[in-house]
Amino acid sequence: MIAALARTLWLDSLPRAYFGDEPRVAAFLYREYRGGRIPNFFTMGWNTWPVVGLSLQGIFVPWLGLHMTTLRLSAALFGTLGVLVTYLLARELGSWRLALPAAFLFAVCRTAIDFSRLGIAHSQILFFEPLALYLWWRGVNGGRALSYLWAGIATGWCMYSYNAGQLVPPLLFAWMGLAAVFAPR
């Protein structure tokens, strides 16, 4: 609840100025989807950001129209879901005693809130990275192939949402190495 409020209250007026990339993302979405066209999702779009991530940023545009607030709303959604997935990840790693403070700290983290209030693709990483790690760790604990499959899909989404998401596979592999050393099964 705290995460959602911090990311959505006064979304249309805070931050007061538009971040320079927000109108560029809006212009890209307008140009690519004009006339009902659907772009190739696996190419690079504006500023070499993957088209999948840019398109996901405009997920509410068909219903709410192309406005900065609409783009910011999708960022707020990803940031809020990131807090939920961080809770699930910490709970999978430990207990609710670890999960509650982890989710709370992420919910009130200024940088995470800032990214979640901008109409750009950065906040998608705040959701997809902990999702990939949660699903992978769930696979380790439960031994289910389906969890590993979804972890791979979430990792792929990281790589196709924003450039910083390209760091997620090395982080996941490092985490696998740590798990192999400290928690062998």
Kindly give the residue locations of the regions a language model identified.
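Membrane-integral, polyisoprenol-dependent glycosyltransferases
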Residues: 1-185
